[in-house]
Amino acid sequence: MNESKLLSPNGIVKASALCLLMSAFSVNAAFAVPVLDREVMVIQQGRTLTGTVVDNFGDPVIGANVIVKGTTIGNITDVNGTFTVENVPDDAVLQISYIGFKTLEVPVKGQTTFNITLQEDTENLQEVVVVGYGSSVKKDLTTAVTSVSSKDFLAGAVNDPMQMVDGKVAGVVVNSVAAADPNKSGSIQVRGASSLKAGNSPLIVIDGMPGGDLRNLAQSDIESITVLKDGSAAAIYGSRGANGVILVTTKQGKAGKTTITYDGYVEHDFVASKPDVLDADAYLDKVTGAVDYGHRTNWYDELINKNNFGHNHNISLSGGSETTIFRMSANFKGKEGLDIASDRKEYGLRGNFKHTTLEGLLEVGGNFSYRIADEDYTDYASFKQAVQLNPTFSVDEMDAFKGNSYSFNPVKNLTEQENGAKQEYSTIDLNLKLNILKNLNTELKLGRQGHNKKQSQYKFKTHKDCINGNYNGYALLKQEAWTDWTLEWLGNYSFKINDEHDFKIMGGYSYQQFDYEWFSASNRDFPSDAFLYNYLQGGEYEKVNGRLGMESHKEEEKTIAFLGRINYNWNDVFLFTGSLRHEGNSKFGEDHKWGLFPAASAAWRVSKLPVFENSSAVDDLKLRFSYGVTGRSGFDRYTAQAKYSGFGQYYSDTYGKFIMGYGPGNNPNYDLAWEKQISYNLGIDYTLFNSRLSGSFDAFIREGRDVIGEYPVPLPPYLHDKIYANVGTTTSKGFEFQVNWDAVQTKDFSYSTNLNLAYTKSKLKSFSNEKYQLGYIEGDGFPSPGNPGSAQRLEDGIEIGSFYGFRYAGVDDAGNILIWEKGEEGGVTKLGADGNEQDKVYLDGTGVPKWELSWGNTFRYKDFDLSLFFRGRFRYKVMNQYEMYYGLQVVSGDNKLSSAYEENAHIKGPKVICDYFLQNGNYLRLDNITLGWTPKLNTKWISNLRVYGTLKNVFTLTKYSGVDPTTVTTTGLWPGIGGMEVYPTARNLTFGVQITY
């Protein structure tokens, strides 16, 4: 091994991480728990209990916790499943628990010997599911809610927590187009896109705090992720609930002995697929205008960090007594990107506690977290340049690109600059709960979420921008700060009438304030690169009068809400939930600050009918229907208000200096209100064959009203030619199907499978009225060279994601693309270069997958388990920019894809946006394969051990000729464009260990 590499900082970090991971196997220490005086009295007065704990196959359960409920007195079972607990009183209750089994409570009642059988925790109808401002037993849900617990998360390395449930929830799309970039998070969309200007991302709620940031979480700290999909479930969150709500619950402490858990892994990324570019010899042989500069460079490979390494370590401490429970964790995570520039290091602390006092009258609890992320960024433009650049240039070549804004050295573009950020995330909240009566309580919650980001960038004088701009260095410092304050006061009351009518009532008040500040300063032309971005005043550029190198900005938003909910259960047969939220928000127009968001849902437990009374097949069968009104408010703050803006500096003869000119910066709209969404959902939940088969089916319709758009207005009377107004209407329809089947269950072998299938179709019904008219909205134009225009358009009655362009009609004798005039196939043809608006039509297909599929399979043989997880998207198209720009021979001197001289060899002319480049995006991928070992250990110190290996992105079946179909955005308003600035797709290998002491 190269000694210099071994002793480098990077080498030391890698070696240390590996040592830490392996050292977890050799820990041999006990953790002592102090014994309370009250427990000493128990020891002096009780008796000795012995017993055996087995599973439903009669095998001993090794390492099960056996404790006296409400105390820390207890023991764990040995290799034979036996236990001994001394000095236990006759009226005590034993609590037996083990991972993967249902917790069991057994009264002592004077016994001294126990034979205990634990049941596997499969589909538990009594499972408690978190919902908005509360929780519910799973079997009593009346809305479309899906919860994924930590035991069902996808294994392996992730950039953000939602990747652990990607494909696990029908109707939820997690679009990770650059999964191997450590600083990139995926976009999330629930049941399609419906908004033009107010956002399509769901609300994130972490431990009850709305507006949370998922990157403030270590994946090992998450207990469950719950998605509120329909309007009735999300309406309790008012103007932020229309895009769905994601509730994240972190792990909490449990009463009993204190446990220490280590959860860690190491990982490595491989390039899974890359563009098929001509090598240097093929380039010189085939490309017109090719020039040989004497080198043989694979630009794409030069950008890849083949020795990338990632590691993640989480240590947690958890435990408690009858009155106090706690959990604390520390996390360190480091990941190098698949490219030579990107990197990320994270350090985090998280803790929570709950203390009950005054004989249960008062509960005090809280959460805190602090996380630092040190980020180094990359530039995706380098990967675009790596495809088109002459492969005979030297890796160090710079002079050839002077004054050329089109071509640059992609390697130097990354190495000749420092670009990154330091981010701090913090959360603290305190909860006070007063249990006035057994069925009446009130809770006060105060919380603060903070996020600070300091971005710094320095381009050396050898960077392409500095060379072309003729200045020595460029520096930028940018600071952003987000602060969210939350105050909530809730009350809960429950009562029963004649043991048949069960009522639960919740009412509350919510206040939330969002503050945002932003500051940016830049300069250029420095005497030296040595100071980087730490010497802004040294640059000469901003010293010239009339040049302003600083900007600052501040925003504030407030939300106040009064909310209530009632749950009614008649004899466990008929269930009803109704909720109402009255909310005011400072973002809206002066005359529309307040909104009302009602919701209602009902369910009928069909399995209670006499026909199912003695059925051995039907455990639970429930039909439900829901209606809800939600809102959407994700547009920019102050859009409704009048704003003044600077319009440049002007020299004043009167004052002898430059003075900033100000004027109205927009057209205010005091009638601007929240977007409304009316949702209907019909669903069925089923559990069959002693919980072996379970699942759900949902059909939904969502109607968007008062959708915000930007509309042209006349000058005068308006001061500007555009205004924001509530005009549009949208619709989304679809259905979702989920099924879980424990197919085989024997003593040594089991097999379970689950399938999720979702169909979604979204359409823009209209976005014009008598006052505001807008014919259509064009998507983003394609990049230079040339001006090919846009490939997508939004128009009344057209599906979101529709493609718009020419119909391909072949080529002429010179190899120029021909199109059908007026889009009429079989009619008159013309040159694509001569095409006009009259020749454009809506092309077949959209960029939104109609079908989303996931299929999970888990096999267990004795102590080993194997899981395979497949994902797929179907019935959608992709406009392949790679083929359009690099798969044609027309641009002289640029490198090409091999397809330019193979599949596309007949095309010699310029690119044209037509359906020739519109490809089938369908794919099926073996996304995750995990092999794990969970041995039954013969040790008193280690209660649980799991070792696993995960391979992600194993293979992909697709006809798409681009780099990878998953690099194409399929969410938002403009899905299905296969861009060129594409980060490499990775195949990830992870080895991990989980140990509980």
Identify the meaning behind each predicted range.
Residues 63, 87, 115, 127, ...:
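Extracellular/lumenal ectodomain signal focusing on beta-strand-rich modules
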